[in-house]
Amino acid sequence: MTLSHAQTPLVFIVSGPSGSGKSTLVQKMLEVPGTMFSVSCTTRPPRATESAGKWYDFVSEDEFERRVQSGDFLEHARVFGKHQYGTPRRWLDEAQCKGLDLVLEIDVQGAEQVKQKLPHAVAIFILPPAKEELERRLRARGQDSEEAIKRRLERAEQEIRRYTAYDFLVVNDDMDRAGREIQAITIAARCLRSCLSQRAHNILESFGG
């Protein structure tokens, strides 16, 4: 499904701390017809459950820097002072050509860059219900050391402090409900005046106005 030719495709930004459930909620968004996912580029190594090209393209530091210098990224940032992440511009071009809404799963640094370049992008922040629950989820994943969990919790606080920069907040205390909420946001955002102004103009013209 593509959007109406008179409807402007949207860019959705989804951010949230590690363990907030944002990746699962992004999958819920992609169940809404007319959406596509922006595959991020990163210098970090793939995890055991990850395959290249689905959620991330994995590249070397040299390759990432080459792409930065070439202006290939809509946004890019170094996370935890370690690995780099970036959103290739080609996904935005492809979404616009296909008439699809584009979903970006990016951190708060990247979100700020995108909002500066695309002020009408719809930004959604995923909140955990509490610090204790976030810590429980991080431990349950079994992927991180104690030091890494501590760093993630510290970063989570820093990220949550920036929630006011976002248009919508989803508290993920129940995945089913949070999934319905983020799908509702995806659909409702398409009814924004900024998205439908051209269509409204065309309708008005049909009256001879």
Model-derived segments and their meaning:
Residues 22:
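Conserved lysine of the Walker
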Residues 15-17:
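P-loop (Walker A) phosphate-binding loop of NTP-binding proteins
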Residues 2-3, 184-209:
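C-terminal accessory "lid"/substrate-recognition subdomains
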Residues 44-49, 72, 96-101, 112-168, ...:
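A glycine- and Lys/Arg-enriched "phosphate-lid" helix/loop adjacent to the NTP-binding pocket
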Residues 1-11:
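Extreme N-terminal, non-catalytic leader segments
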Residues 30-40, 61:
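Post-Walker A helix-loop "phosphate-sensing" segment adjacent to the P-loop in P-loop NTPases
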Residues 42-102, 109-112:
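ATP-dependent small-molecule kinase phosphotransfer cores
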